[in-house]
Structures are given as structure tokens and as C-alpha cells.
Amino acid sequence: SDDGKSLKQFDFIVSNPPFKLDFPDTHAKVAAQTARFWAGVPNIPPKIDPKKPKMAIYTCFLQHVINSLKDTGKGAIVIPTGFITSKNRIEKRILTKIVDDKIVYGCISMPSNVFATTGTNVSVLFFDKSQSSDKVILIDASKLGEEYKEGTNQKRRLRNFEIDQIIDAFRNKKS
């Protein structure tokens, strides 16, 4: 809906949003949806310069995912690892809400170059709106994986036994 209050709700959501993107043409419309984007919307840079970073649009996707989950919904979203320690107002509001409301279940910091074609270090946040645990499992998988080349790109991939270790840690709530 245009006001952001009547979103379709889902049992499960998995999202891989763009991290940086400009949307100056629709910024005002998006920013007006305060129920949907309760932590805020990133500001438009004063002068859009192709050499400078674009807007942190992933913060909008993160809020959208949380608002689109049913009360018993579960979800996962890929985010830049820097989100967890960000001092930015919007990121801090989102992090505070998902921890205080006990929405976030866990976070895995992934190895660099493991994901798509981005050089950005990424983490995966897991949500479970049906649980109300006081604990969030944090897994540092940033040193795992093996290097390989794909064309001219140096990449990293998790091996099956490492994936099993991560799954086991989540199931047993061990970091």
C-alpha cells in the first residue's frame, strides 16, 4: 500500500537486497511511509556522484522484511557486516528494535569474497518472530572456507563440513 501499513505478510522471507543504490525519484514517497520504515530512510546525497557511495538502501529492505513477516514468521537477510557496529542513526534504530523486540535469532559473519561479486564483507541475519529468546547466537565464520578463482575473480567458498559446523552451532545455540 502507499502508506506502508497494509503489507502482505509471509511465513518465510529470504532476501539479498542491493546494499547501495540511489532512488531520488521515489525517495519522498518511500520516506513518507513511516509505519513501514520506522527507523528512517537514508538521505539523498547532496550531489549524486558516481565515484562516491550511494545510499544505504539495504536499511529499507531490512525494515520491509521485518514488517512483512507474520507474527510467527522466520526470515534471513544478507547485510553488510558493518551494520552490526554502525554508528549511523538508521542502522542503530533497526539494531535496537530487532534486539529489544527479540526478533533477531542469530547472525553469521561470512568470509570475505564468499558472496556474489561484491568485495563487501557480509553477514546473514536470521529472524524468528515466534521466539522470544534473550540470546542471539553470533557465529564468526569469516576465517572459514577455501579460496578459488572464478574467471579473474578471487573468491571463497564454504566447504560442506564447515556448513555442517555452522548448522550444528545454530541448532545447539553455540557460538
Regions found by a protein language model. Name each.
Residues 3-175:
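A conserved structural/catalytic subdomain of Rossmann-like adenosyl-cofactor enzymes
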